[in-house]
Amino acid sequence: RGALDVHAVKREFATDRPVTTLREALVGADVFLGVSTAGVLDADMVRSMAGNPLVMALANPDPEISYDEAKAARPDVIVATGRTDYPNQVNNVLGFPYIFRGALDVHARKINEAMKLAAAHALAELAREEVPADLAAAFGVDRLEFGPDYLIPKLTDPRLLGRVAPAVARAAVESGVAQRRPDIE
């Protein structure tokens, strides 16, 4: 934790525990965030994590651990992958088009942290709202509601454009990088 060669942002997440492997690091961990390669996480590692762990296995096309294997390891695990065929698909398509649309709408000089945070907050708010029945039906379910299997909106949610892009545009205006101020509801 006190290492001089670790950036201050990373230092906050460092540990004083003597760990040298991923397996050791995951003991009691709340979150696994993987963007590496298939198979680096196994069921025993998931079982060693804290209660209700979040496993974000985002390697594509095959995640660090499959959704089914993670759920079989422990039913309380919350799993997100980059795959469309499982709950909680994490995909940059949820951000980039709407961040760019919001930036273009206000002729933003740059895309800053405030704009990215606005996009993240808009996605989080949308995930907590009631999902239209036709969208749920498109995924073969009667209902989608915020919880372990629905943390993030679906890529095909038609409400994304009307929520995320305006939030980004508003943040650009408020943070001073917008060159024009369109009507934002």
Which residues make up each language-model segment?
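Short, intrinsically disordered, charge-balanced linker/junction segments flanking boundaries
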Residues: D183-E185
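N-terminal Rossmann-like NAD(P) cofactor-binding subdomain of oxidoreductases
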Residues: A14, V35-A38, G51, L58-Y67
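Adenosine-phosphate binding glycine-rich loop
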Residues: A57-A165, A169-R181
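A short, aliphatic-rich alpha-helical micro-motif
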Residues: A25-L26, V46-M49
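Glycine-rich phosphate/diphosphate-binding loop of Rossmann-like nucleotide-binding domains
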Residues: R1-T37
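Conserved acidic residues
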Residues: D30, P53, V77
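Glycine/threonine-rich flexible loop motifs
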Residues: S36-V46
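Short acidic, glycine/serine/threonine-rich loops at helix termini
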Residues: R1-V6, D44-V46, S66-K71, N91
